[in-house]
Amino acid sequence: MLKPTEDYSDYIQRLFPSRDEFGDLKKIKTFTFQVTNDCSLCCTYCYELNKSKDYLSFETVKRVIDYIFEQAKLPDTILSYEKNEGIIIDFIGGEPFLNIEVILQIINYFETRLIEEDSPWLFFHRYSFSSNGVAYRNSKVQEMIKIYGDLLSIGITVDGYKELHDKCRIFPNGAGSYELAVDAAIDLKNKTGSDSTKITLCPENIDKFFGAVTNMLSLGFVHINANCVFEEGWELKDAKILYQQMKKISDYLFENDLEDKCYISIFNKDNFCPLEDTEDNNKNWCGGTGEMIAVDYKGDFFPCLRYMETSLPKDRKPLIVGNLDCGIYTREEDKKTLEFLESITRKSQSPDKCLVCPIAKGCAWCSGYNYSKFGTPNKRATFICIMHKATGLGNWYFWAKEAEKKKIKCEFINYLPKEEAIEIMGENDFKMLSKVR
């Protein structure tokens, strides 16, 4: 496998490619602008439940940016230069490019303030986007890429190939968006050299994973980040399908000598083993408990966009931690919220089965989804559990195949108990892989 591009350290290295010239960056702050609640698509797996036609205005943006720089100069604030040697301005929606005029105003004004303040962030800032690609050809989007290309990280989601993509990523009238998304992704790759893409797996499309990967590879996207959604709905049958899909992908890669020419995030030999009981391993996986800040069109601040009204069921109150009038984490109730968020650990939120799980390493969760589902970020949703097990077994197959092909020792050890493994992969595969040393 090629080196990954999307773990945190590599994400920072990609956004700040020259950072080694200036020394290590101890901390990068991510500040998210939800520039609109509106979207051109109605994706079946979208976690934003309550979209609207609300758009962030430049008047609100200007106040937010002024507040960021005001707080950055003060010691011991969540945005201070002392704590944050760089900053990523993240744009999300809905679909962010629907508000491209304001996005350009945000970037222009932020760049102006960086120069005016002689800010330490002048050389350490980037703008990040997650887009469905539908509005990519907008002339303002192209203008932004032309002017600020080196400062941008734009992710266009393409769920593999047409049938798969158009099954989930659809317009309100039911039409698919594959052609527009692929056109955007390929043009962006040609202009910026970005050869990565993201595939979101859910129960509705898990059986199309193999075709999705092979199609993206054929289009020249050799860094493929794939993940299963955290939401409820996964069953044993889905785990069996995922394992078989990972087998097919593995066979395809080795048969075509592609195993060292691409990166597929779901294959990771360093995960799927027990976690040592250390202080570092007890930290919260997710950054949505005090590390990130998001702002909506009203100027309200949140620990993460998934605590906003757009991402929550009707009976769940948004978790607001400040506004433009009072600031971030300044009111007593907000200070208590921050103290609570920062106290959340793997142990505090996990059920016993997770703490003793033999393949706990690499099993992820989303604190915002925990809040959405249970009303607290300190209760871990485990709907993804069966898929983590299947992913581990798919890795066992991949790394065993690598060992056989290269005539080397298999570097992957299966820690999942035999009974649980056989339930997903079958007895024949379990016996076959157990013989590989």
At which residue positions do the language-model features occur?
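Short, small/polar residue-rich loop motifs at catalytic or cofactor-binding pockets
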Residues: 285-290
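C-terminal accessory region of radical SAM enzymes
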Residues: 244-275, 307-356
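Radical SAM enzyme core and accessory elements
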Residues: 1-18, 312, 347-437
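Canonical Radical SAM [4Fe-4S] cluster-binding loop centered on the CxxxCxxC motif
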Residues: 25-63
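Long, K/E/R/D-enriched contiguous segments that form extended
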Residues: 210-281
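Radical SAM/AdoMet-radical enzyme domain recognition
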Residues: 69-92, 99-231
